Amino acid sequence: MAMVSLSGAFRKRVLMVYLTAGDPYVDSWVIETLSEHGVDIFEFGIPTARPKYDGLTIKASYRRAIESGVTLEKSFQFIEGFRLRHKVVLTYFEYARSIGLERLMSYALNAGAEGVLLPDLLIDYSEDADVYVRLCKQYGFEPIFFITSSFPYKLISEVARLNPAFIYMGLMASTGTLLPITISRNISIIKSLINNTPLLTGFAISEPKQVLECIRAGADGVVIGSAIIRLISGGGEKQHIKEELR
């Protein structure tokens, strides 16, 4: 199968936004507003009852989606419904294994996604990484890997040699927490290990100064999720939310 490439997104610094597929607050106008105002890649989360590395905001988003009747099939119907420059799918390997990893890849391909990210893969299931890489090739995806600064340097270098679309570096242990002052140093070290592989940073970014800090340290882009979900689910007026999203 021909390879789907996200390389076009990385001709400049990248903004990737996380949204939960099927969260009642993730309406079409939210996605359209974000798309019109500079979001390069949309990362759609597949709701699961056990989002073990997410903070309270995204866990609540998953819960809303599940309680509203969202299923695996409905999640991908939601994703398929939007024509966007770039979109990827995020879910946990633990969940993907329970439904069938190949089934997940097939759904992602049919929904027009350009990759599948499994944040717990290298943390909890590193022995299955070769299966993930093989299925990515089978379905025409470049692999995407999630790492943290606590990963062994040798492993990070090995992951970069697998030619991923990008590497997503989690800055904190869970989403939505505060950034420590050592972040810039960690980003610089990781970037030196992966050479030309694009590096996106996320898990705790909510303010413009944090974005600048990551970019200055060498990141090729940032991922914002919890801050946006808090905004759209906070009960504000639609026009005010639109202005904030811009």
Can you describe what each PLM-predicted range is?
Residues 2-9, 24, 48-60, 66-79, ...:
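Active-site-adjacent beta->alpha loops and helix N-cap segments on the catalytic face
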Residues 10, 35-36, 79-84, 105-110, ...:
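Acidic (Asp/Glu)-rich catalytic clusters
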Residues 13-19, 42-44, 87-91, 116-118, ...:
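Hydrophobic faces of well-ordered beta-strands that scaffold small-molecule active sites
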Residues 17, 34, 42-45, 108, ...:
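Conserved, mostly hydrophobic/aromatic
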Residues 26-36, 102-103, 150-162, 201, ...:
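Catalytic cores of alpha/beta
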Residues 40-51, 111-125, 167-177, 204, ...:
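Glycine-rich phosphate-binding active-site loops on the catalytic face of alpha/beta enzymes
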Residues 82-126:
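Hydrophobic alpha-helical segments and helix pairs
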